[in-house]
Amino acid sequence: MKNIDLTNWKLLAEIYEYLFFFSFFFLCLLVIIVVKFNNSTVGREYTFSTFSGMLVYILLLPVKMGMLTKMWDVSTDYCIILMFLSDFSFIFSSWALTLLALERINNFSFSEIKVNETKILKQMSFPIIWVTSIFQAVQISMKYKKSQMNLEDDYCLLAIERSAEEAWILLMYTVVIPTFIVFFYVLNKRFLFLERDLNSIVTHLSLFLFFGALCFFPASVLNEFNCNRLFYGLHELLIVCLELKIFYVPTMTYIISCENYRLAAKAFFCKCFKPCFLMPSLRKLQQPTKSTQF
């Protein structure tokens, strides 16, 4: 809490503005690619649940920006609601992404096992992730409220500051626990996979764990240090690092939801930019030869 007076809130609000525009455009791009160019229907409901949760989180960024610039002066209760919605939307997206990964893993298994487990998963999944996400978001929001009970002024600024201090909780809830659930699920079914499928799953798990740790771990470890004495602007950078989830969660959702994410992206860009940019080899093929000119 010693770093609060040193935080450049206007700079942080400006960074939030850029994050909002880039992340909103990026999310819309991924949704278009998934809807138009992804032939796989496995786990589509989980895919769009993850995208919906991240969309809510992104749309809350301008609200945070308005509070950081003192454009809106809201009460303590409204600030708690804002922090709850922000945490809930992200936690819900993380659990929906976990269920998407589990269903995609079932798709690699034998048909009988796949059908039975997919039905059970769909029947139980959404009530479980709703209850789990609400419980975890309320728990974190109560920590915000308890730590700021005697600090009524600039409450939302302090709540956003507290979000960096509670980063290790979000790291456990949204990265470590889901990753280990999927890992043990794969470990239990490893004999059902081809080697290339198993390698692909392990690679995706490693990427998700790496980007999640990159997002939350620095803020949780360096929280007790006076970061601005170490490096000016490091404190704001750590808070901004927490927002990297608006990029890596949709990206992992897109990669996991597609049968071939490279093919889907290639089809999208070819359709959009083919009239303007053609490969030299394609141009040569389209040019008439000497024998056909006459």
UniProtKB/Swiss-Prot annotation:
It comes from the Viruses. Residues 1-14, 69-79, 141-166, 222-236 are extracellular. The chain crosses the membrane at residues 15-35, 48-68, 80-102, 120-140, 167-187, 201-221, 237-257. The gene is U51. This is G-protein coupled receptor homolog U51. Its main location: host cell. Keywords: G-protein coupled receptor, Host cell membrane, Host membrane, Membrane, Receptor, Transducer, Transmembrane, Transmembrane helix. The keyword DNA repair does not apply. Belongs to the G-protein coupled receptor 1 family. GO terms for cellular component: host cell plasma membrane; membrane. Residues 36-47, 103-119, 188-200, 258-294 are cytoplasmic. The keyword Protease does not apply. GO terms for molecular function: G protein-coupled receptor activity. It is a multi-pass membrane protein. It is found in: Host cell membrane.
